[in-house]
Amino acid sequence: MELTSKEFKSELILEVQACLQLAVPLVITQILEAGIPLLDGVMMGLLNSQALAAGALGAVTFSTLASVCRSILSAVGVNVANAFGAGKIDQVSRATGQGIWLAVTMCLPVMFIIWHFDYILLLTGQEESNVLLAQTYLRSIVWGFPAALGFCILKEVSSALNRPQFLTVITVAGLLLNAVANYVLMFGKFGLPALGLAGIGWASTLIFWLNFIAAASWICFDNYFKDYQLDCALHQFDKDMFIDIFQTGWFLGLQYGAEIGVFTATALMMGWFGTETLAAHEITVETESFVETVSIGISYAVTMRVGQLRGQNDLKSASRAGLVCIALVTPFVSIVALIFWLFPNYIVAMYLDTSNLDNIEIVKTATSFLAAGAIVQIFYSIQTIAAGALIGLKDTKVPVLITMFAYWVVGLGGGYLMAFTFGWGAIGLWLGLILGLVMGAMLLTGRFYLLTSEIESG
């Protein structure tokens, strides 16, 4: 039945309200979570430029591996959202349990890789002094990895159940404590040894565990969650559901691994241009990552919203939810892009003393990177939300192929050609990222449009 114009506007307003109700706390939480690595990057710069460069290697390594694992675990949220939408309360606890077992399965091998990642960094041609310093960071933050995955599962479940607000409170406290812990452990206050870059890693480990314990405690004592019997999750191993979550998560891990892996590979190639270029790249990436948390938060919301509506078999509304979220993020990222273009010096000044002549090359390079980063974050935001909507539909296989083609063939391949073959230098790598993200945004958004058009017509 066709909707009248008034009815359509009414449903559209209701969908915007529903998306915002879920998205706002998730965006705030995501911003606060991203505040930890951003704060770490700023405080690395307080040590010296080498600590900032080495910290970039360590941070991007940990972030890449952690993000892949979190992406795999996002399949838990999709399953919980489907069960919640369908009113299958018993399936909520069962899906949560399988997610916990999956996290346990991944934890030890990934921690082993992080511990020994210095060998891989050396093979990529990084300066040995930077690698040795990055190793101290990696071998301290690695102990927070299990807690980071645990918090991820609790975030997925609470978001799928429309109860993410308490996460904001926890992450506010975590960010404030992280600043204090960084300062104390970096510079050796209150009788503690000055650990330098390693101190930042230990501070992150502490915050990961405190956040996880706080979230688990909140869920245990919040009456809202009692009907879902999440405390029994570990006692309900379901082989079929475990395999289903793993299969869905595996493709999500590949998709996000391909995406984030491009940024990792780009950082490694930036290292070939020297410490100053790598430091400038770290400034741009950290700032970019912080801004993109808004898009990532909205993408979590659209995944849960589309997943819930899919569970209700209301696929027309699921289509509307995806398009509404894409429309919501576009004005924000456009404004931020203008800030990147107009005020790059103020952004760089958050990390380094721009009046220090020793930093002049870093400032100049970072300014050019930020101009390219402005374009990057517009298309990154669009493709991230489109990908989130497709996850809610449990469409994962084709998006993996799209992501690999867009990022690795178009993005990294094009960036390498421009940077090294054409001789454009480090900025060529950022131009390659722009090409890859434009391609990814177009293809993923187009696929969501095609799938939902088929749904509506069918």
Name each region found by the language model:
Residues 1-23, 80-146, 192-250, 306-375, ...:
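Short alpha-helical transmembrane segments in multi-pass integral membrane proteins
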Residues 21-40, 140, 174, 207-211, ...:
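Transmembrane helical elements of multi-pass membrane transporters/channels
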Residues 26, 30, 41-42, 59, ...:
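Transmembrane alpha-helix boundary and packing residues in multipass membrane permease domains
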